[in-house]
UniProtKB/Swiss-Prot annotation:
Cytoplasmic side: 451-821
Protein name: G-type lectin S-receptor-like serine/threonine-protein kinase SD2-5
Listed Pfam families: B_lectin, Pkinase
GO CC terms: plasma membrane
Subunit composition and interactions: Interacts with PUB9, PUB13, PUB14 and PUB29.
Species in which this protein is naturally found: Arabidopsis thaliana
Broad class of where this protein is predominantly found: membrane
Cross-referenced PANTHER family: G-TYPE LECTIN S-RECEPTOR-LIKE SERINE/THREONINE-PROTEIN KINASE SD2-5, G-TYPE LECTIN S-RECEPTOR-LIKE SERINE_THREONINE-PROTEIN KINASE SD2-5
Residues of this chain annotated as glycosylated in UniProt: 51, 121, 174, 248, 329, 370, 380
Extracellular topological segments: 22-429
Modified residues (Phosphothreonine): 652
Length: 821
């Protein structure tokens, strides 16, 4: 397919071409190029070199096997790896790399590398003297750059920006580490069940402050220092990692699988020289310098934490699946033991407390009642309680002590892993006594059991269903807090304050003992409600983002299914843009724009930054919540669809809300993350216009808002669609024009024409130019009119009370796109 850059893995045998063996292209390759590692075996697999011959791109052997290869960029003289395309999916020496005549880059077989090039054809691939691999379009612009997609290495002059992530290869304990810029700081975290931060540049003693204030949004290795800039490229901080002040040297920073960042000077034609500076500088400052539950002290001297060594000789907790239950649905016997005195934990300086101003007994109870909690830390001075679902290495706290009391959860000695043989032995004497005492009692018991079985069959089947769900929840990574039903019942005052009601249940206001407020969704019924519960816990429970609503916890107890979210005082966007009376608060343009931008960032994170691509499938104003400062947070993931990174489209049953669904839902085409883009475009239009996308009370010209917006665009009068009730809207404000054009790009009928959500963010921020979109005023009415008529006959559409022209075929497409939910 034209316009898509794809690298694919295969087992297709390719015979080497002796005429081309060992000859690497210099500077760039053009369409028609092809070859395997065997073709370039005399050049160590390198088939493309930079003009200065410092860097090479080609097939590089992996550390684990000399017969498997990654498509990588290397610094030739030092053989240091700079970037890899397929680190997780190496290829064989016969797999053929092809840059075909259409400008696509392929290796026929299983897809491992994909690039959406926004409809531009590639004319060449360049390996630049900086080590940057660039796909160049026919008009000479860059389509894609390796510098924008780092793996575990950064190199001099490479911009590392907010939204990018450096990820280590897995460690021996299967842990990975990540470096990213978040909330104005650069942080290192371990990707355990719930990521735990263990280092930040803002707290680094070596940091040099060049300018107070400002928010870090990017960084680069320049000279002998790591430099940090704000959005206007003003230098805020520096981190000097070498005494070598030669600005002509090339440095790399590598995030190793031990969680440590090291620096190497690639020199000029010489072998690499490593700097003694490391991040973190403390030998005991990483999550696992010694292994879980060991204490690291001094020069990385390791010993089992004293409390655990007294309880178990092997320094292991005996817990493999903390939330697993025994065959008779009982919880495995566990206990909390003191970790001992004088120990500290790496995440305490960065993690938020689970509960504030509490006491030690309550903190223990919180951990005991939460099956995913493996350890707790309690600070006497503040009353803060910290719970962790992963415990790495401890470290000695020094003479002053850490100020924390710590406890570890371990399996009780002699629990036997939940074997039911002991229980059977206990029950057998009672059965014998009953049989001996009276046959009559046995007959009565049999009769009662039979009656219960007949009358309450669903109740008797509930444990099996509950066990199935427990297994599902147990196998989730990053599972949030599991509440008991009575705790949420108490927090909501027996569900007395109702905030709203949706398709799967009602939402109630609640307050935890520490004073933090919750919004508790109580799912009702079975079927879709059960699916929504699993989808919500599995998807949002493991991800965290400023613009995604946080799932504080859940309850799966008997027939009860509840979801506990952070409480957002301003409610949903719907109540703020669709004003029911003149006295309602009117949002100004700055607030509306920030809501639009925040929502776009949240969706971009779901689509591009999670382990699996997440398609929300139900973006609408009711599912965008607002906090005290009107920051937008995307909510309600009950209809979301997971897609692997290899999938570009997926078929699924229709889901969502009428008026916001993309055309592909109606035409039974495969959907993708671009379907969310369409829904977002509809919401953005409503946010700009302060009205619903279909309003039969309007004139025939205005009743279908998207068609009206396209018409005004063609007339050059886009300002006519802005909410007329907003006062003092600056017509010269570029954000207004960008937002309106971006909305019309998002609701294009052809999904390939719609931008990605990350591109939408760039368009709104002014980073990417927003040209006038193609006209699509009829909105595909020829495709959807028959669908609309069919749902109208079934009672799925509401008859308009407005002008008759509003019900004409020209307006059918987006009026009731999705049909009944």
């Amino acid at each position: 397919m034209r316009g898509v850059f794809i690298v694919i893995v295969t087992c297709l045998v390719f015979l080497p071409d002796p005429l081309r063996a060992g000859v690497a292209s210099i500077g760039s390759i053009t369409p028609g190029f092809g070859g395997s590692q065997m073709n370039y075996i005399n050049n160590d697999g390198i088939f493309l070199e930079s003009n200065n011959s410092a860097f090479g791109f080609g097939f590089v052997t992996t550390q684990d096997s000399v017969t498997l290869f990654t498509l990588s960029i290397i610094h030739k003289s030092s053989t240091k790896l700079i970037w890899s395309a397929n680190r997780a999916s190496p290829v064989s020496n016969s797999d053929k790399f092809v840059f075909d005549d259409n400008g696509n880059v392929v290796m026929e077989g299983t897809e491992v590398w994909r690039l959406d090039n926004s409809g531009k054809n590639a004319s060449r691939i360049e390996l630049r003297d900086s080590g940057n691999l660039v796909v160049v379009s026919v008009d000479g612009t860059s389509i894609w750059e390796s510098f924008d997609h780092p793996t575990d290495t950064l190199i001099t002059n490479q911009a590392f920006k907010e939204g990018m992530k450096l990820t280590s290869s897995p460690s021996s304990s299967n842990m990975t580490y990540a470096l990213e810029i978040k909330s104005g700081d650069m942080v290192l975290s371990v990707n355990s069940l719930t990521p735990q931060v263990y280092w930040s540049m803002a707290n680094a003693r070596e940091r040099i402050i060049n300018k107070d204030g400002g928010v870090v949004t990017s960084s680069s290795l320049l000279g002998n220092s790591w430099r940090f800039f704000d959005q206007k490229q003003v230098l805020l901080w520096q981190f000097v990692f070498s005494d070598n002040k030669d600005d002509n040297t090339t440095w790399i920073a590598v995030l190793g699988n031990n969680g440590v960042i090291s620096f190497s000077n690639l020199g000029s034609g010489a072998s690499a020289a490593d700097s003694s500076t490391k991040i973190p500088s403390d030998l005991c400052g990483t999550p696992e310098p010694c292994g879980p539950y060991y204490v690291c002290s001094g020069s990385k001297v390791c010993g089992c934490v004293s409390g655990l060594s007294r309880a178990r000789s092997d320094c292991k907790t005996g817990i493999t699946s903390p939330c697993k239950k025994t065959k008779d649905n009982a919880t495995l016997p566990l206990q909390l033991v003191s970790a001992g005195d004088g120990v500290d934990y790496f995440a305490l300086g960065y993690a938020p407390p689970f509960s504030k101003k509490t006491d030690l007994d309550s903190c223990k109870e919180f951990c005991h009642n939460n099956c995913s909690c493996l350890g707790l830390f309690f600070q006497n001075s503040s009353g803060n309680c910290f719970l962790f679902d992963y415990i790495g290495s401890f470290k000695t706290s020094g003479n002053g002590g850490s100020g924390f009391v710590s406890y570890i959860k371990i399996a009780s000695t002699g629990s036997g892993g939940g074997d039911n043989g002991e229980d059977d032995g206990k029950h057998f004497p009672y059965v014998v006594i009953i049989v001996v005492v009276t046959v009559f009692i046995i007959a009565v018991l049999i009769f009662v059991a039979f009656r219960i079985h007949k009358r309450k069959k669903m109740i008797l089947e509930a444990p099996q269903e509950s066990s199935e769900e427990d297994n599902f929840l147990e196998n989730l990574s990053g599972m949030p807090i599991r509440f008991a039903y009575k705790d949420l019942q108490s927090a909501t005052n027996n569900f007395s304050v109702k905030l709203g009601q949706g398709g799967f249940g009602s939402v109630y206001e609640g307050t935890l003992p520490d004073g933090s407020r919750l919004a508790v969704k109580k799912l009702e019924g079975i079927g879709q409600g059960k699916k929504e519960f699993r989808a919500e816990v599995s998807i949002i429970g493991s991800i965290h983002h400023l613009h995604l609503v946080r799932l504080r916890g859940f309850c799966a107890e008997g027939a009860h299914r509840l979801l506990a979210y952070e409480f957002l005082s301003k409610g949903s966007l719907e109540r703020w843009i669709f004003r029911k009376k003149d006295g309602d608060v009117l949002l100004d343009w700055d607030t509306r724009f920030n809501i639009a931008l925040g929502t776009a960032k949240g969706l971009a994170y779901l689509h591009e930054d999670c382990d699996a691509r997440i398609v929300h499938c139900d973006i609408k104003p009711e599912n965008i919540l607002l906090d005290d400062n009107f920051n937008a947070k995307v909510s309600d993931f009950g209809l979301a669809k997971l897609m692997t990174r290899e999938q570009s489209h997926v078929f699924t049953t229709m889901r969502g809300t009428r008026g916001y669904l993309a055309p592909e839902w109606i035409t039974n085409y495969a959907i993708s993350e671009k379907s969310d883009v369409y829904s977002y475009g509809m919401v953005l239009l409503e946010l700009i216009g302060g009205r619903k996308n279909y309003d039969p009370s309007e004139t025939s010209e205005k009743c279908h808002f998207p068609s009206f917006a396209f018409k005004k665009m063609e007339e050059g009068k886009l300002m006519d669609i802005v909410d007329g009730k907003m006062k003092n809207v600056d017509v010269t404000d570029e954000r207004v024009q960008r937002a309106m054009k971006t909305a019309l790009w998002c609701i294009q009928e052809d999904m390939q024409t719609r931008p990605s959500m990350s591109k939408v963010v760039q368009m709104l921020e002014g980073v990417f130019p927003v040209v006038q979109p193609p006209s699509s005023s009829t909105m595909g009415s020829r495709l959807y009119s028959s669908f609309f008529k069919s749902i109208s006959e079934d009672g799925g559409a509401t008859t308009s009370s407005g002008p008759s022209d509003c019900n004409s075929e020209n307006y059918l497409s987006a009026v009731r796109l999705s049909g009944p939910r």
